Every structure is written in C-alpha cells, then in structure tokens.
Amino acid sequence: MAVQTTDNFAFYEQLQHYYQANRRKIRSRYNDLTRKFLAYNDREENPAAFLRLPQFEALEMYVFIKEFMGNPQVYQMFDDWRNRRDRFADASYYSVQKDGQISLLDFGRTTDGRQVYLPDEVEKQTDILFKQMKKYKEKYPNYIYALTMGLGKTILMATCIFYEFLLANKYPRDKRFCHNALVFAPDKTVLQS
C-alpha cells in the first residue's frame, strides 16, 4: 500500500486558524495600548477605521506574532506548534488545508484516497520543514506577509511601523519593538500614502 502525506500544507494557515480560534483569549493578553491600537483599526469596533479587512487581518497577525508569540523565529513557532508546546500546548490536533478542509495531523492518504494513521511519516515531514525553516532564519525576526497588488501594502507597512514606534516609545527596553525604520519611497504615490 503506497502512502503519501499532504503536499499543500502552509504553516501560516495554521497560525491564522490558531489565532481565529483563540482570538478573544489572545487579545485579552495584549497590553492596553495594543488593544486600543487594534480597536482603532478594527471596523467592527470603529466604523471610521481606515484599514480594509485584509489589511486589518494582516495587522492582527503581525501583532499576534510580535506581541503574543514574543516575536520568535518562524522555525521556533513551527517547532512549538508541531510538538504542541508553550503557546500551542492546547492547540487542536488537526490542520486546515487551503481548500478549507480540516484533516488530522497524524493521518495521511493512500494513493486511492483512504486515510491512514501515519505519525512517523508526519514526523518525518515536519522535521524536514523544521530544518528548512531553521536554515533560513534571520538575526532579527520581523514579518511582513504578502498581499495582492492594490490591496494596500504601503498603508499596512506604515501602520506596522507606527505600531512598532508607538510600543517602542512606551516600552523602550522591550527588544521586540524596533526604534528605527528606513523607508524607500520610489514614487509620489507611496509618498502620498
């Protein structure tokens, strides 16, 4: 019986699912300034908020990784997630696929589509992913994720920089927040933003 594991796994989807499932608990642990900053940018709480939904969701994930997770390297978050430790100790044992389907992590599929228990195969696959992530780590983890063209990356980046400066000013000794930013603006459109 030939067995294959899933090839459409994306860790950011697991982070997003974890955040959505625990959003209230996570946001309650943010400091007051962060909660006010998010509320100001959230159209559900502030109808006059400037950010559109995809921008706000990206900002929420940025703050989640920065403040709740402690700004770790991606490989560290992935290792904690796959081993269900620290922040992920109470995480569910399933993963969300790109098509929205949920599958158990410890299962794979045979070539004819049947699900089989594969803890060793899954462990091998996640170990390979972990090693790749660790290989490409940066000295200072700082994450800006891709948004499609025209969705407002410039405004989002400016909002993230403002968040960084706001918290760096309030908590100057907290190494999670940057105190400097270098911005290159190639044309007038970016400068107007």
Regions found by a protein language model. Name each.
Residues 18, 61-65, 160, 164, ...:
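Generic, well-ordered alpha-helical scaffold segments in large soluble proteins
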Residues 1-29, 44-45:
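Charged, low-complexity intrinsically disordered regions
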Residues 23-146, 155:
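Conserved pre-motif I regulatory segment
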Residues 137-140, 172-178:
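Short helix-terminating capping/connector loops at secondary-structure junctions
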Residues 153-168:
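Motif I (Walker A/P-loop) of helicase-class P-loop NTPases
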Residues 149-150:
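The conserved Walker
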Residues 154-156, 174-193:
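Conserved Walker A/P-loop ATP-binding site and its immediately adjacent core
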